[in-house]
């Protein structure tokens, strides 16, 4: 309509006819229907159309070519006479005020075409000139006939016309200026947008170049790596060839060497691993792929500047649109660069870029400029806007526009989304909640809880209506939830139906209500208690239901206010159904097992939901495994497929299987194949037939290491965590074999019935197993390639060319090749990586030639040669003579080694082997510093030696021999029935000996019955194993001992492997050290050479230790620099500060220039750990001392009284003289290293490093004895007063053995409380052999022997008790001191507050007569055969009543039937009023507070401590004991004494401590039992109903305990070997 309006034009006659029709001068004003302006009817500047609507001229700007005017409101046409040229301009005289108000932008918006405006103005000028002429020609007549007023009126009209022309000229001038500015701005925007595109292309070009350069660099690095690998292999092969030539030159050496082993070594070091080197292939030439023609075509048509017409002008609406457009344009200018569609995915709609595009709807005019880039569609189709088409900008009016528009493809199926399954009815009816709505769910939960907790309960008169929204306290979901009432059942017999409202009930009339949880999907049934069962149907019982007395407590009615708050949160539960599956048995419906398995796979985890369609509000979906980069999940690839595989469902059409699994199935790397026409060493692992069998390459023990790791992992792993619910074809997995061991496998068949067919990829055999024996494979086990290579024998075919191999041929081939080491000659590599091979038996004697298995089958008539095959010539090859090699030297040295002096080897033995690569066999690994190796050439020697020893000792008889350390012997290995040479390390007991089998490097403990004297002729041969240690590494964690993890890892990695060692030259001495320092290299599973030391460092099990050669004396720093006396050290520091003062430097920096720098250099150099002098023991047998501390191991540290003053003096001098030590560089502390320690009290002490634990160091304060773990920054590696011996002396009690041979924690606690800071008398009994060892003493405190004291309380056992009982003679000073210290005051004992009533002991409970079975409860376990029991509650109550009848204690006021528990409850309520306990006699009854804060009956056992006072009490009703302070004891009310003590101490019959108990941890107070036995007994007694039978009467109660099945409770201990039967 706008286009049609733009084609109309104004005409003089039309305006004259319509504007002046029968309208006299001075008529009333009319109002424009469109803009509302009021125009005088006399002015003629209005148009009254035939339809009756009136418009001003400004609202009807028309061209001369138009013949009709279309009404903008009703669209009725009005004819116009274009031949008349009259155009009235007088009307502008009265409209000047309006024109002044029109802003330039408004004029511009109203104007549609500059040319049209100029034409209109020209017409106006012509009309004005014509009017002037008419006035001049008629002036004479007018003067005669008209008055002067008419002339003035005409002049006034002309004056206003002139002013109007001036205004129009100014408007044109402004439009010209605006147009120029607009052109410049549009050009600027276009340049900016295209500059962004150019920047994008430049960035893309850089990214392409960088990506190509990176890819090329990676490829070149692989080539360089392969090249270096080839050079290394060439060097290794050259060395091996030299060894072989040497053996040929010296035939005598063949008797001592295994020629087959040498040949196999040659093959292993060359051809067997070249396959890995040949993996880098020449890649395809790079090529840049750019669709230039399409891009150029798009650029040629990209962007268009349009001028769109508009005939309507709405100033207010236009202003709003401009503001919105401006915001949108600014946003798009920022995002245009990033959102530009990829060229390969977008297509441009050519119709948009040409003039053929249909005109857009009319919009207000604007000047904003944008780029237009619409997507291509096929040229045959016209681009249409789909619901998914998003226009980036709204369509514009007549203005230069450049539009960006993006078209999004409409997918057939929606993309996957993460969801949670909230409720499952069956696989075709379940509810989900979206993962993206988690925040909404939390907000909803918070709002609902706030409303429900704040609102009041329902009133019984409230009305409940079906379908109404309600809030309910959900049982299953555990929160307040939104719900919908789905069923209401009234109480029987009441008129519950309301008139005209059959679905409404009062709350008090409801018997049963069912509510559907709209946010979870489940339904819950609330049943009113007492309702007749007829109201409850089976479907109600199947759902979550609960019986309530009052429904008002769990229901809240929804209010309009709450609905308004929650209206934005739609129900979160979405009903879903799995696509295209039905129950396995359609007649019976879904089984419960299907729901259980469904929940098992999806419960409590996020899964990926793929939506296919929607039917009646239900989503048809499939639940799948989420993407790995989002959430780790055990979800199967497809839940539908899993249910079908488990035979719980079936497809409507069996062709509807998901193809998603093909892209997610894990696969192994294919096996590494040897090259054609090469020979490799193999083992045949599985045989189907001579034309179908599998072999493994012998590349080391990596396959064994892999298999062992897999077995250990899956044997200990929880099976359900890695269970495969739905296997797919060719899926990599781990499967259990019939031997119970887990191996790598892949799925090759799905026969159904919960079974899968798998192939073991490392062996080649197949098996059909259940799904329970299949597990997911870990990533680290997936990286290794398959080990089994499929092969077929070359040159031969089934006998007489039959189609299949005979059974005899298969059996014969298995007999010759199955599980044997063989040499394989690869003839050709067939399709599907099948090798065509010839097998040779390589286990013959050295002088025998190898035999071909292929030929043997033909000779035995089990196979035939292929047609055209030519027999080979088996002529003997030329024998070459090789040069001598290092191995020949090794063989000679093995014979020359002296086994007796193996730890002081002469230099010439290994001098020639230093820094050479020597092949060895790792026979035993104990730790990184103790590794036993054998030369590869000693295998024959070891076999020969074993034969000699069997001949010498097989029938020998044992004779008593007095064995001593370092004696040589012959040792029989019982489990292997072998004899080995050995050397005694130590005598463990009289019958057990620890020996070293030095030919194989094994240490073990054997019985002396297995030892024989070693004959002299068997000593002539040297040791066949060497002890080595890895260099350049040290234990991690700061300790000087290797961790068990490091030892186990190294043993698993090296034991039994063939490796290469390089003997390292000792940098300090020329003599050979022992163990031999070596570097060990071996091959990993990828065939790469690995340095074992670096391997341990990489695993974090070791740290690198530098080996730095000794510096010259001129460059070394004397260690005495670390021992500068502190006075001198302080002066040196002061001088440094004076002579090198620099205001810009800190003091520490100045010191470091001259002194600290040298100290730091000393730290980094190899250092010898130095320490302080050992303690000086007083030269007297008896001396006084102060106990400084008691160590955790029971060591008593004492400081002699005579040395205390010197210790205080030295400590003060250290604090006053030790100033600034500077900042310490990173320092590696060693165990035993002396240092200066800054303690927790900020004082400096002398110390010694005990252990390095992470970033902290455990140090010992040498002059005080105690240890502490402190940060490394509080240590400094200097010696303080190194000439002064250590002040504190470590001591141990003489001839005193603690329980369990080590001081137990409770004994350590007693020693610490008893001796800390106490003055004691020391009697020296035995001086230590090493001055750093403990001094053996007798210690007396206040005349009491410490050994006797500890033995009395059964913390230890001690000899010479009669000597210890003698008290030390006391002088008069001691007696005076004792009297002063023990001054007795008894005034306070007479006060009334301390009066304690005399109470009788507790009554004891009695057991039934012997032989009677009665129920008991075990209250406390002292040891496995000593417990406290009480009779069952009924019998206890009866006994309590019997005692209360006979009780004449005078206590009254309580009910005779009150039980003990009730009485204690009443006492606990007013325990604050009870008086404190003041009488601490043994067996004194009292009330004691237990750990639970309640008070129970107890009695005093002993006083444990005096400062503070601690009392040991026993709870008489339970048997347990506790050490309590005074505030936890009070006097017992007398009425509680009438109840007998419930706990009865009994001994258990039927078992006793075992004679041989290997448990290391003993019960401290009962060392004959182990802690393991105690815990096992507690497990047997806990949580069971027990019965007892008395075996012996009081005083020593002995009973036998039985469980509820009448079995003795101690039998599990006997079966576990923790106890022996007591007959």
UniProtKB/Swiss-Prot annotation:
Keyword Transferase: no
Localization per record: Cytoplasm; Nucleus
Xref: InterPro entries: RNF17-like_TUDOR_rpt1, RNF17-like_TUDOR_rpt2, RNF17-like_TUDOR_rpt3, RNF17-like_TUDOR_rpt4, RNF17-like_TUDOR_rpt5, SNase_OB-fold_sf, Tudor, Znf_RING
Residue ranges annotated for the Tudor domain, each copy included: 726-784, 962-1021, 1228-1285, 1479-1539
Principal location listed in the UniProt entry: cytoplasm
Residue numbers carrying N6-acetyllysine: 234
Alphabetical UniProt keywords: Acetylation, Cytoplasm, Developmental protein, Differentiation, Metal-binding, Nucleus, Repeat, Spermatogenesis, Zinc, Zinc-finger
Disordered: region residues: 1-22, 1438-1462
S-S pairs: none
Subunit structure: Interacts with MXD1, MXD3, MXD4, MXI1 and PIWIL1. Self-associates.
Protein name: RING finger protein 17
UniProt source species: Homo sapiens (Human)
Gene that encodes it: RNF17
């Amino acid at each position: 309509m706008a286009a049609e309006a733009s084609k109309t034009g104004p005409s003089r006659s039309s305006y004259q006819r319509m504007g002046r029709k029968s309208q006299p001068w001075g008529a009333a004003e009319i109002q424009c229907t469109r803009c509302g302006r009021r125009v005088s009817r006399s002015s003629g500047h209005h148009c009254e159309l035939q339809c009756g609507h009136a418009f001003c001229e400004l609202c009807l700007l028309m061209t001369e070519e138009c013949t009709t005017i279309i009404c903008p409101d009703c669209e009725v046409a009005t004819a116009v006479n274009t031949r008349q040229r009259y155009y009235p301009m007088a009307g502008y005289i009265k409209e000047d005020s309006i024109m002044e108000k029109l802003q330039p932008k408004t004029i511009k918006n109203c104007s549609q075409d500059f040319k049209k405006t100029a034409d209109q103005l020209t017409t106006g000028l012509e009309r004005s000139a014509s009017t002037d002429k008419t006035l001049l020609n008629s002036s004479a007549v007018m003067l005669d006939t008209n008055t002067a007023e008419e002339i003035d009126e005409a002049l006034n009209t002309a004056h206003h016309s002139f002013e109007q022309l001036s205004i129009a000229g100014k408007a044109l001038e402004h439009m010209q200026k605006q147009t120029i500015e607009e052109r410049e701005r549009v050009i600027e925007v276009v340049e900016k947008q295209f500059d962004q595109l150019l920047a994008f292309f430049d960035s893309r070009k850089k990214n392409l170049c960088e990506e190509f350069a990176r890819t090329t660099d990676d490829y070149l690095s692989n080539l360089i790596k392969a090249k270096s690998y080839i050079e290394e292999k060439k060097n290794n092969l050259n060395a091996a060839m030299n060894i072989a030539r040497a053996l040929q030159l010296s035939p005598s050496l063949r008797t001592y060497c295994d020629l087959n082993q040498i040949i196999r070594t040659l093959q292993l070091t060359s051809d067997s691993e070249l396959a890995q080197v040949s993996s880098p292939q020449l890649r395809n030439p790079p090529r840049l792929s750019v669709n230039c023609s399409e891009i150029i075509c798009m650029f040629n048509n990209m962007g268009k500047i349009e001028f769109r017409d508009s005939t309507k002008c709405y100033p207010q609406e236009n202003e709003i649109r401009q503001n919105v457009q401006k915001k949108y344009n600014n946003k798009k200018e920022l995002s245009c660069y990033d959102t530009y569609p990829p060229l390969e995915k977008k297509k441009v709609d050519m119709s948009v870029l040409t003039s053929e595009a249909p005109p857009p709807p009319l919009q207000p005019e604007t000047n904003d400029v944008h780029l237009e880039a619409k997507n291509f569609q096929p040229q045959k189709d016209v681009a249409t806007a789909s619901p998914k088409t998003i226009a980036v900008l709204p369509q514009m009016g007549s203005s230069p526009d450049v539009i960006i528009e993006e078209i999004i493809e409409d997918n057939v199926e929606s993309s996957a989304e993460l969801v949670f399954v909230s409720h499952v009815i069956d696989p075709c009816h379940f509810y989900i909640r979206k993962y993206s709505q988690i925040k909404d769910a939390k907000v909803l939960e918070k709002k609902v809880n706030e409303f429900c907790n704040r609102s009041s309960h329902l009133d019984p008169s409230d009305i409940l209506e079906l379908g109404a929204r309600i809030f309910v306290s959900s049982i299953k979901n555990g929160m307040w939830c939104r719900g919908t009432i789905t069923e209401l059942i009234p109480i029987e017999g009441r008129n519950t139906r309301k008139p005209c409202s059959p679905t409404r009930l009062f709350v008090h009339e409801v018997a049963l209500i069912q509510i559907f949880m709209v946010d979870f999907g489940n339904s819950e049934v609330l049943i009113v208690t007492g309702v007749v069962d007829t109201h409850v149907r089976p479907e109600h019982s199947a759902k979550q239901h609960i019986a309530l007395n009052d429904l008002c407590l769990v229901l809240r009615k929804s209010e309009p206010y709450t609905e308004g708050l929650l209206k934005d949160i739609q129900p979160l539960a979405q009903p879903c159904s799995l696509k295209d599956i039905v129950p396995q048995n359609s007649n019976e419906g879904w089984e419960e097992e299907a729901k259980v398995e469904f929940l098992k796979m999806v419960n409590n985890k996020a899964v990926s939901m793929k939506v296919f369609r929607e039917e009646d509000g239900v989503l048809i979906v499939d639940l799948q495994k989420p993407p790995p980069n989002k959430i780790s999940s055990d979800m199967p690839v497809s839940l539908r497929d899993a249910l079908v595989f488990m035979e719980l469902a079936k497809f409507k059409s069996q062709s509807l299987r998901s193809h998603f699994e093909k892209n997610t199935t894990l696969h192994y790397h294919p096996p590494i194949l040897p090259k054609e026409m090469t020979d490799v060493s193999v083992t045949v692992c599985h045989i189907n037939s001579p034309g179908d069998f599998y072999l493994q390459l012998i590349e080391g023990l990596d396959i064994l290491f892999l298999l062992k790791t897999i077995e250990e992992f899956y044997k200990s792993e929880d099976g359900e965590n890695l269970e495969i619910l739905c296997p797919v074809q060719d899926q990599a997995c781990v499967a259990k074999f019939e031997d119970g061991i887990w191996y790598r496998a892949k799925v090759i068949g799905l026969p159904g019935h919960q079974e899968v067919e798998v192939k073991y990829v490392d062996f080649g055999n197949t098996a059909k197993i259940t799904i329970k024996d299949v597990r997911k494979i870990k990533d680290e086990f997936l990286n290794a390639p398959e080990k089994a290579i499929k092969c077929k024998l070359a040159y031969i075919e089934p006998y007489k060319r039959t189609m299949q191999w005979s059974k005899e041929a298969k059996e014969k081939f298995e007999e010759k090749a199955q599980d044997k080491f063989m040499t394989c000659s690869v003839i050709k590599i067939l399709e599907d990586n099948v090798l065509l091979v010839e097998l040779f038996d390589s286990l013959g004697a050295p002088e025998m030639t190898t035999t071909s298995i292929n030929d043997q089958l033909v000779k035995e008539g089990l196979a035939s040669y292929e047609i055209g095959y030519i027999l080979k010539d088996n002529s003997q090859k030329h024998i070459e003579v090789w040069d001598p090699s290092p191995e020949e030297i090794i063989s000679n040295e093995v014979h020359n080694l002296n086994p007796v002096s193996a730890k002081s080897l002469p230099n010439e033995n290994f001098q020639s082997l230093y820094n050479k690569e020597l092949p060895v066999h790792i026979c035993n690994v104990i730790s990184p510093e103790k590794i036993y190796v054998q030369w590869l050439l000693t295998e024959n020697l070891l076999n020969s030696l074993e034969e000699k020893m069997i001949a010498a000792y097989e029938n020998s008889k044992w004779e008593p021999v007095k064995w001593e350390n370092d004696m040589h012997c012959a040792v029989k290995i019982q489990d292997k029935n072998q004899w080995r040479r050995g050397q005694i390390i130590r005598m463990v007991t009289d019958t057990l000996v620890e020996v070293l089998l030095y030919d194989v490097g094994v240490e073990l403990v054997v019985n002396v019955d297995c030892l024989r004297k070693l004959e002299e002729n068997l000593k002539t041969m040297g040791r066949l194993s060497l002890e080595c240690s890895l260099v350049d590494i040290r234990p991690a964690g700061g300790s000087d001992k290797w961790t068990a993890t490091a030892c186990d890892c190294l043993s698993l990695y090296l034991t039994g492997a063939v490796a290469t060692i390089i003997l390292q030259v000792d940098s300090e001495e020329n003599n050979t050290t022992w163990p031999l320092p070596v570097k060990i290299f071996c091959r990993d599973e990828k065939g790469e050479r690995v340095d074992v030391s670096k391997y341990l460092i990489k695993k974090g099990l070791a740290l690198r230790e530098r080996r730095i050669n000794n510096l010259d004396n001129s460059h070394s720093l004397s260690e005495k620099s670390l021992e500068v006396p502190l006075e001198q050290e302080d002066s040196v520091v002061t001088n440094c500060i004076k002579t090198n003062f620099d205001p810009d430097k800190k003091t520490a920096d100045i010191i470091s220039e001259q002194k600290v720098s040298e100290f730091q250099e000393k730290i980094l150099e190899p250092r010898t750990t130095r320490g302080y002098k050992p303690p000086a023991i007083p030269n007297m047998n008896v001396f006084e001392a102060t106990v400084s501390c008691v160590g955790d191991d029971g060591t008593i540290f004492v400081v002699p009284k005579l040395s205390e003053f010197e210790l205080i003096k030295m400590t003060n001098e250290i604090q006053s003289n030790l100033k600034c030590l500077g900042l310490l560089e990173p320092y590696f502390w060693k165990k035993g290293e002396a240092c200066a320690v800054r303690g927790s009290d900020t004082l400096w002490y002398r110390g010694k490093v005990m252990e390095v634990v992470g970033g902290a160091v455990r140090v010992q304060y040498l002059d005080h004895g105690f240890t502490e773990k402190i940060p490394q920054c509080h240590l400094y590696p200097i010696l303080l007063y190194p000439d002064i011996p250590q002040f504190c002396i470590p001591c141990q009690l003489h001839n005193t053995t603690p329980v369990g041979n080590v001081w137990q924690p409770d004994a350590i606690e007693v020693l610490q409380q008893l001796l800390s800071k106490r003055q004691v008398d020391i009697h020296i009994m035995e001086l230590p052999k090493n001055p750093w060892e403990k001094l053996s003493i007798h210690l007396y405190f206040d005349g009491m022997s410490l050994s006797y004291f500890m033995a009395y309380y059964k913390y230890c056992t001690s000899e010479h008790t009669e000597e210890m009982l003698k008290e030390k003679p006391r002088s008069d000073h001691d007696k005076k001191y004792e009297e002063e210290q023990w001054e007795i005051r008894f005034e306070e004992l007479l006060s009334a507050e301390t009066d304690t009533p005399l109470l009788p002991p507790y009554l004891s409970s009695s057991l039934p007569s012997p032989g009677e079975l009665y129920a008991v409860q075990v209250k406390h376990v002292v040891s496995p055969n000593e417990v406290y029991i009480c009779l069952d509650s009924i019998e206890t109550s009866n006994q309590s009543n019997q005692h209360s009848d006979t009780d004449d204690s005078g206590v009254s006021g309580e009910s005779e039937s009150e039980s003990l528990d009730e009485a204690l409850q009443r006492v606990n309520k007013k325990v604050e009023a009870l008086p404190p306990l003041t009488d601490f006699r043994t067996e004194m009854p009292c009330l004691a507070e237990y750990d639970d804060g309640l008070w129970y009956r107890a009695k005093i056992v002993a006083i444990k401590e005096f400062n503070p006072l601690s009392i040991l009490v026993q709870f008489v009703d339970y048997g347990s004991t506790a050490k309590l302070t005074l505030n936890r004891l009070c006097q017992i009310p007398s009425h509680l004494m009438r109840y007998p003590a419930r706990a009865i101490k009994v001994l258990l019959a039927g078992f006793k401590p075992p004679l041989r108990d290997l448990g290391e941890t003993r019960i401290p107070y009962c060392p004959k039992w182990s802690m393991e036995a105690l815990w096992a007994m507690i497990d047997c007694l806990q949580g069971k109903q027990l019965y007892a039978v008395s075996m012996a009467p009081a005083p020593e109660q002995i009973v036998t305990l039985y469980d509820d099945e009448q079995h003795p409770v101690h039998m599990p201990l006997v079966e576990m070997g923790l106890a022996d039967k007591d007959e």
